[in-house]
Amino acid sequence: MVDQVKVVADDQAPAEQSLRRNLTNRHIQLIAIGGAIGTGLFMGSGKTISLAGPSIIFVYMIIGFMLFFVMRAMGELLLSNLEYKSFSDFASDLLGPWAGYFTGWTYWFCWVVTGMADVVAITAYAQFWFPGLSDWVASLSVIILLLVLNLATVKMFGEMEFWFAMIKIVAIVSLIVVGLVMVAMHFQSPTGVEASFAHLWNDGGWFPKGLSGFFAGFQIAVFAFVGIELVGTTAAETKDPEKSLPRAINSIPIRIIMFYVFSLIVIMSVTPWSSVVPEKSPFVELFVLVGLPAAASVINFVVLTSAASSANSGVFSTSRMLFGLAQEGVAPKAFAKLSKRAVPAKGLTFSCICLLGGVVMLYVNPSVIGAFTMITTVSAILFMFVWTIILCSYLVYRKQRPHLHEKSIYKMPLGKLMCWVCMAFFVFVLVLLTLEDDTRQALLVTPLWFIALGLGWLFIGKKRAAELRK
């Protein structure tokens, strides 16, 4: 794959079918931060808090710890060969063409499914202000807007993600500061609840639902981290990947502590975990509970922006994956063509059309949170597959190309050991998904995707990939 796709610097005249390196360090850092603050944090944290109580803090820390090492593996691999434009490329190079095919199409499907969840979330957030608003109106408006803006240039995507991420950062930092002030002032809500850190351990301790509740929090919590690997799809369009990628990946632990741990501590200090409504976003409900409806509208705008940001990332990454797959000969040739602005326009349009499946999902499952849970479970499973492929690629890389590892400027710490630890953790999460009815249904449906992919590779992909290599 890496021989088929070329990238050029911004100041060079682009050859036909070449991606341009238009994303600066500023874009990459904010894309990484925005990817780490997903819809799952805003939309799914209500359910995870109700399932696990304060122990959900440890759930997010554990998942974040594991994914940091997955990202370190991805970073070392991408920088070992700057012709790699994404993890689909090194999977194809190290594991074989089948791996690039499965990874590329699965990642495309991951983001389409995630985009559907974002459409569901956007619909819910829009109904906060307009209870009678049609699901179709809210969804179509956002999808058309994202399509139009992404058709412009890759730099436009970078700018959109920059400002989307800035809104999320300002909102979460503001929430943390306001929450800390409330705790310091012993603020009392209209219901008589006094803000206090003691809520974290006084109402049943750190593990009020026991180990079963603690384990139940992992499914939606995993979904909150999807998109953390997004910087890996920008490698071919980054001006200085050797500096930008390590900086973005190394900041992951700080982002997790700041945006996940601190925000959840504040939420459960102001609003006792037992009072959190699983069907609603606790970020919005926190301000409603303390009698600040105007602030609740602002936060609702922020979480709506977060969902739009996630959908924006999905539209970007899926179009790039389709472009790479088409270059490999395992996707329709039309997706391999770029517009005059070096944007894979046909891939963008196709992915946006697929996002409308989120609206269909709402009609199949009228419960917003029910539809969100089903979609996010499928997404979490597929993302774990992609993360596992990254780890497997790293193990093969260490075995077959030890000289590249020795020369690497960005070695993964505890490389081989942590690969196995992370994969064991993903198996553990899959086992947990069998415990709940709604997640079990999604777990049973997911293999159908891999069966369809396998048949596609057997009858079409394998032959086309071989012809292209000749």
From Swiss-Prot:
It comes from the Bacteria. GO terms for molecular function: symporter activity. Pfam families: AA_permease (PF00324). One of its GO terms (biological process) is amino acid transport. It is found in: Cell inner membrane. It catalyses: D-alanine(in) + H(+)(in) = D-alanine(out) + H(+)(out); D-serine(out) + H(+)(out) = D-serine(in) + H(+)(in); glycine(in) + H(+)(in) = glycine(out) + H(+)(out); D-cycloserine(in) + H(+)(in) = D-cycloserine(out) + H(+)(out). Uptake of D-serine is inhibited by D-alanine, D-cycloserine, glycine and at high concentrations of D-threonine. The chain crosses the membrane at residues 30-50, 51-71, 102-122, 128-148, 162-182, 211-231, 256-276, 283-303, 350-370, 371-391, 413-433, 441-461. It is a multi-pass membrane protein. One of its GO terms (cellular component) is plasma membrane. InterPro entries: AA-permease/SLC12A_dom, Amino_acid_permease_CS. Keywords: Amino-acid transport, Cell inner membrane, Cell membrane, Membrane, Symport, Transmembrane, Transmembrane helix, Transport. Its main location: membrane. Disruption phenotype: Single deletion, grows on D-serine or D-serine plus glycerol but not D-alanine. A double dsdX-cycA deletion grows in D-serine plus glycerol, but not D-serine or D-alanine alone, growth on D-serine (but not D-alanine) is restored by dsdX. Mutant exhibits increased resistance to D-cycloserine when grown in a minimal medium, but no change in D-cycloserine sensitivity compared to its parental strain when grown in a complex medium or human urine. NCBIfam families: PRK11049.1. Belongs to the amino acid-polyamine-organocation (APC) superfamily. Amino acid transporter (AAT) (TC 2.A.3.1) family. E.coli CFT073, a uropathogenic strain (UPEC), was originally isolated from urine, which has a high concentration of D-serine. D-serine is toxic to bacteria. The abililty to take up D-serine coupled with the activity of D-serine dehydratase (dsdA) may allow use of this amino acid as a carbon source in a sugar-poor environment. Permease that is involved in the transport across the cytoplasmic membrane of D-alanine, D-serine and glycine. Is the only transporter of D-alanine. Transports D-serine less efficiently than DsdX. In addition, in minimal media, transports the broad spectrum antibiotic D-cycloserine into the cell. Transports D-cycloserine only in minimal media, and not in a complex medium, suggesting that CycA does not play a role in D-cycloserine transport when E.coli is grown in a complex or biologically relevant medium, probably due to competition from other CycA substrates present in the medium. This is D-serine/D-alanine/glycine transporter. It comes from Escherichia coli O6:H1 (strain CFT073 / ATCC 700928 / UPEC). The lineage of its organism: Bacteria, Pseudomonadati, Pseudomonadota, Gammaproteobacteria, Enterobacterales.
